[in-house]
Curated annotation (Swiss-Prot):
InterPro entries: Ribosomal_uS11 (IPR001971), Ribosomal_uS11_archaeal (IPR019961), Ribosomal_uS11_CS (IPR018102), Ribosomal_uS11_sf (IPR036967)
Annotated source species: Aeropyrum pernix (strain ATCC 700893 / DSM 11879 / JCM 9820 / NBRC 100138 / K1)
An individual GO BP term: translation
GO cellular component terms attached to this protein's record: ribonucleoprotein complex; ribosome
Phylogenetic lineage: Archaea, Thermoproteota, Thermoprotei, Desulfurococcales, Desulfurococcaceae
This protein's name: Small ribosomal subunit protein uS11
Gene3D superfamilies in the record: Ribosomal protein S11
Record key words, sorted: Ribonucleoprotein, Ribosomal protein, RNA-binding, rRNA-binding
Known function: Located on the platform of the 30S subunit.
Entry similarity comment: Belongs to the universal ribosomal protein uS11 family.
NCBIfam families named in the record: arch_S11P (TIGR03628), PRK09607.1 (NF007176)
Amino acid sequence: MAMYPRELKWGVAHIYSSFNNTHVHITDLTGAETVARVTGGMVVKADREKPSPYAAMIAASRAAQKAMERGIAAIHIKVRAPGGHGPKTPGPGAQAAIRALARAGFIIGRIEDVTPIPHDTTRRPGGRRGRRV
């Protein structure tokens, strides 16, 4: 006997974590329809707390609650850092957001990193002599 219902409704949790904020965006499998979208800045008062793991945790749990109300029971997770010219590693809120989604009761499918990595990039800002401070 299976523990879960035969047909699970799957979704995709897109977690964008920079050093300034954390976005948790849950969509259907195609990514076309938004189910829930919460950011760290929406759940804390002070701007300096937006990138914190606490803000990411609260944002992820709120998004999870909205998604469960819409019937999503299992999710794949896509983690993204700024990438390109910016940092290629996710910010401090990424891990907290993943843990919060797991604790919310979702069945976790795949966790993948979708940070845009340039293969021979365009020129970085700053010019030939660099950024003069």
